[in-house]
């Protein structure tokens, strides 16, 4: 059944009636966003997105509004379920301006299975996005890299992109550190050599080593090497 403005309005009213005040308060502490928060958990929103995607996905997206944080999250999850590349890219590009927090950014990218299936396309897309002056658009690019492109020939291409990226955004810096910590797991030697070249800010290097040392997939010897590297480079 197609979505209409009235059906959508009634649907959102029902969602709002299911909001959890305590979960809303928790979300407000960990997500900084301009959108009012209802207090709905991610597993519930994912189930709703699946239902919508089986129903009439495009008519839903024609009605969707951005009045609450959960509506934006739900839109991201529905877009992530699109399987046709051209259709996906159309909605993806239009959605980027709505992203104002790490949770929506990471949800969109991590839920979009099409990005792994069309890896070349989205690696190119990521290279474009990281040039954006909008921090959460740039973060989308780096999260695409770490979620879908830590494989094959892509990592070697990432290092100069990281070096040339210029921003003091906390959320982009954290995404870069996250990316490098993931690269250390599967491409330890190459990534360690890159870290030793000392192109990174003190903040990103510290966060990279911290995240890497939290991983159970690196050996004690590797973690000791990274800690020593950090100590040597940060004066």
Show where each model-derived region lies.
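Alpha-helical scaffold domains
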Residues: 1-235
């Amino acid at each position: 059944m197609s979505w209409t403005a009235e059906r959508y309005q009634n649907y959102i009213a029902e969602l709002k009636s299911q909001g959890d005040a305590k979960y809303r308060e928790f979300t407000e502490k960990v997500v900084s966003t301009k959108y009012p928060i209802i207090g709905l958990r991610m597993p519930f929103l994912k189930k709703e997105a699946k239902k919508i995607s089986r129903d009439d996905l495009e008519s839903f997206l024609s009605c969707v509004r951005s009045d609450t944080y959960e509506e934006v999250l739900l839109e991201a999850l529905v877009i992530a379920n699109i399987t046709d590349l051209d259709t996906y890219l159309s909605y993806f590009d239009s959605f980027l301006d709505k992203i104002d927090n790490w949770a929506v950014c990471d949800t969109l990218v991590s839920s979009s299975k099409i990005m792994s299936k069309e890896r070349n396309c989205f690696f190119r897309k990521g290279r474009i996005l990281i040039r954006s002056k909008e921090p959460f658009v740039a973060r989308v690019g780096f999260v695409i890299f770490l979620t879908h492109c830590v494989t094959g020939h892509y990592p070697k291409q990432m290092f100069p992109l990281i070096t040339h990226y210029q921003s003091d955004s906390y959320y982009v810096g954290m995404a870069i550190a996250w990316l490098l910590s993931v690269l250390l797991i599967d491409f330890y030697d190459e990534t360690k050599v890159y870290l030793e070249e000392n192109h990174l800010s003190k903040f990103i290097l510290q966060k990279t080593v911290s995240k890497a040392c939290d991983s159970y997939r690196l050996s004690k010897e590797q973690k000791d090497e990274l800690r020593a590297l950090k100590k040597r480079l940060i004066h």
